[in-house]
């Protein structure tokens, strides 16, 4: 009788994942056994401690030169891009947890305490008094850690089956988190249902593509698929169909147009802190998976699929900037901005060079911190119903709160790609890599899209600084320590990466993928 061979596990290499997922499991126990009044402090402390501990473990492993390692029967690849993306996710996760934890802006926190706590006539709203007594729904913290752990596995997945499992681990908590908003409950729950239904549909595409590629290559490992595509004795039908379905699932998660239809509604309906978490961290994980799949498994057949993704990038940029111009809700505007930025990121992803890889990863880092800070600022501008997201509410904001208005102005200019911000450097390195790889027409389209996108950022800036505030306009809440820390972190990193980009670019250039 043959014995089952146990997989070799490099525990040092996967310690950051184990810390995050272990803390998520402890968070579930906290919810089960601690009294309600003790849960918030325990969950916040546990989450922040886990993120810092995972970051320290990652730094120690990177310092010891622990790159180019495959573990768990080659299902995970711990290489230089993995370490960069893990570091990015942990840093962005820290900023998002700070936003989620803040209870000073919204009495009792931004998350509903009980699913059946509603306001008068079943309006789906909680009163401030009810919210303050009930407290904050603290299971959002382990849900965020589970999602973050899934994102880390997704970035490192070296076979399609591991990638699919990680996709579900990161997606399911996000579906729940989207429906936990205290204010505008029905809108939040509608967003959660839409995200779940469309996400399940996209996961089915990914899984079907996985099955076809397994039939094509006889394996789900990326290296085996790469070896199969290098040959000429197999059916191209399975390859093209499998790759197409697989990429649809990946592009959906990255909010790339035309697979972006969930993005505006979910960004608008989800709690603002959760929107920031999704907008920053999910995009990092999704493009981490896209980069690995394209560069490891399908580089040999790139001439067959690059034209399709070339067109998809153009469509995504066009949808993002054109529909972004028409929006009157600031969260929906940022959602369409995200679709446009996904197109810019796709430009670097299909370059298939080390410069394209490094540029795309730098862009993800820069965009993530700017986005976290933007949603932190949005959470401060409030009416009696919650955040003031209609653009008219932001008129004259500089006269009511000049500091908040100028911070938001700086962040919008970073998204527009103005020099001395991280957004400018991110676009520059991505477009330079695309030019070097012979994609000049695509870069021209991207530059035009960037110019058009700058218009709707400038529209908000002009509205804040050169319009008169309404007498019954929204108030600007005094941010608590957590929100202040998250916004400050985002602003400082956005400025530093614009002035000293080598701080991150040198790390991003340390090496490519291993398989």
Swiss-Prot record:
DNA repair as a keyword of this entry, yes or no, is no
User: How does this protein lie in the membrane?
Assistant: Multi-pass membrane protein
This protein's superkingdom?
Bacteria
Major place of residence:
membrane
Say which enzyme class the record assigns: translocase
Q: Name one Pfam family in it.
A: Proton_antipo_M
As recorded in UniProt, its EC number(s) are 7.1.1.-
InterPro entries, per database record: NADH-Q_OxRdtase_suN/2, NADH_UbQ_OxRdtase, ND/Mrp_TM
* GO molecular function term, any single one: quinone binding
Cellular localization per UniProt: Cell membrane
Q: Where are the transmembrane segments?
A: 14-34, 40-60, 80-100, 138-158, 160-180, 195-215, 239-259, 271-291, 307-327, 333-353, 361-381, 404-424, 438-458, 485-505
Q: Name one GO biological process term.
A: ATP synthesis coupled electron transport
Q: Does the keyword Manganese apply?
A: no
Which reaction does this chain catalyze? a quinone + NADH + 5 H(+)(in) = a quinol + NAD(+) + 4 H(+)(out)
Alphabetized UniProt keyword annotations: Cell membrane, Membrane, NAD, Quinone, Translocase, Transmembrane, Transmembrane helix, Transport
Can you supply one Gene Ontology CC term for this chain's record?
plasma membrane
Functional note: NDH-1 shuttles electrons from NADH, via FMN and iron-sulfur (Fe-S) centers, to quinones in the respiratory chain. The immediate electron acceptor for the enzyme in this species is believed to be a menaquinone. Couples the redox reaction to proton translocation (for every two electrons transferred, four hydrogen ions are translocated across the cytoplasmic membrane), and thus conserves the redox energy in a proton gradient.
Description of how the protein assembles with itself and partners? NDH-1 is composed of 14 different subunits. Subunits NuoA, H, J, K, L, M, N constitute the membrane sector of the complex.
For this chain, the family text in UniProt reads: Belongs to the complex I subunit 2 family.
**Protein name as catalogued:** NADH-quinone oxidoreductase subunit N
Species annotation = Saccharopolyspora erythraea (strain ATCC 11635 / DSM 40517 / JCM 4748 / NBRC 13426 / NCIMB 8594 / NRRL 2338)
């Amino acid at each position: 009788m043959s014995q089952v061979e146990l997989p070799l596990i490099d525990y040092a290499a996967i310690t950051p994942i184990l810390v995050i997922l272990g803390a998520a499991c402890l968070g579930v126990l906290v919810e089960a056994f601690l009294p309600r009044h003790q849960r918030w402090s325990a969950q916040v402390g546990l989450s922040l401690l886990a993120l810092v501990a995972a970051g320290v473990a990652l730094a120690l492993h990177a310092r010891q030169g622990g790159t180019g390692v495959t573990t768990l029967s080659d299902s995970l690849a711990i290489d230089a891009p993995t370490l960069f993306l893990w570091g990015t996710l942990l840093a962005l996760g820290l900023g998002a947890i700070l936003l989620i934890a803040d209870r000073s802006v919204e009495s009792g926190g931004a998350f509903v305490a009980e699913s059946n706590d509603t306001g008068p006539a079943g309006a789906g709203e909680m009163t401030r008094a009810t919210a303050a007594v009930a407290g904050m729904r603290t299971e959002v913290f382990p849900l965020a850690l589970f999602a973050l752990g899934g994102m880390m596995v997704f970035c490192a997945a070296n076979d399609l089956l591991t990638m699919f499992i990680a996709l579900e681990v990161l997606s399911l908590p996000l579906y729940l988190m989207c429906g936990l908003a205290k204010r505008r409950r029905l809108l939040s729950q509608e967003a959660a249902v839409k995200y779940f239904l469309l996400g399940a549909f996209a996961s089915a595409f990914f899984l079907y593509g996985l099955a076809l590629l397994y039939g094509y290559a006889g394996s789900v490992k990326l290296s085996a698929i790469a070896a199969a595509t290098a040959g000429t004795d197999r059916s191209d039908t399975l390859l093209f169909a499998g790759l197409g379905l697989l990429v649809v699932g990946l592009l959906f998660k990255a909010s790339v147009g035309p697979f972006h239809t969930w993005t505006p509604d979910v960004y608008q309906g989800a709690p603002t802190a959760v929107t920031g978490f999704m907008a920053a961290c999910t995009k990092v994980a999704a493009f981490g998976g896209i980069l690995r799949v394209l560069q490891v498994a399908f580089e040999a057949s790139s001439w067959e699929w690059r034209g399709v993704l070339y067109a998809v990038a153009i469509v995504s940029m066009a949808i993002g900037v054109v529909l972004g111009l028409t929006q009157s809700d600031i969260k929906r505007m940022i959602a369409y901005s995200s679709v446009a930025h996904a197109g810019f990121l796709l430009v670097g992803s299909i370059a298939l060079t080390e410069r394209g890889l490094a540029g795309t990863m730098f862009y993800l880092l820069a965009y993530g911190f700017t986005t976290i800070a933007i949603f932190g600022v949005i959470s401060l501008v409030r009416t009696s119903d919650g955040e003031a997201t209609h653009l008219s509410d932001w008129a004259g904001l500089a006269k009511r709160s000049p500091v908040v208005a100028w911070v938001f102005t700086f962040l919008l200019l970073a998204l527009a790609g103005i020099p001395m911000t991280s957004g400018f450097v991110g676009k520059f390195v991505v477009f330079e890599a695309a030019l070097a790889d012979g994609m000049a027409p695509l870069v021209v389209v991207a530059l035009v899209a960037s110019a058009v996108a700058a218009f709707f950022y400038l529209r908000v800036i002009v509205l804040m600084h050169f319009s008169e505030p309404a007498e019954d306009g929204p108030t600007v809440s005094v941010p608590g320590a957590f929100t202040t820390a998250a916004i400050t972190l985002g602003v400082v990193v956005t400025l530093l990466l614009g002035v000293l980009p080598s701080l991150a670019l040198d790390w991003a250039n340390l090496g490519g993928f291993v398989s």
